[in-house]
């Protein structure tokens, strides 16, 4: 309980991400880099707190719910918790479903408020989270999550289509703003693109 899904027979997960699913490997790397078993305990306790504070609709908080939910979901996925995990599976699936519903409702756009010029942050972080969920849950452990593939495809494609002509991304997804983009926005979008690539989806 609280140890995440595990197993060595998970070739669907890129090798860069696979080690998170081995408790022994995770603990070994933790100890070798100055951590302790208490660090792992603290992480599990934090995940339990997140589970306890999750909203009934699968989101977290009452502000910027899409972004906050995506960040919370990424913490579970980072511990190799999937929709099928014994202790946290319900929380993971509920969060994924919440984000899928947002994507489906908005034609791939992932944001709490599409009128807010800063919604590009939420879209990138949420796309990252959904892609990570697809790779871990579907490719890695063969879990069936309705419409997850469609959400990843549509949200990822929107991200690609909305790139600034200068190569970056900018507020409100302006494609021709004078400044050409924002470094922090670009960073999240590159992370989302990397996660989308790992899904293996075309």
Give the label of every model feature segment.
Residues 1-202:
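Preference for long, amphipathic alpha-helical scaffolds in soluble/luminal domains
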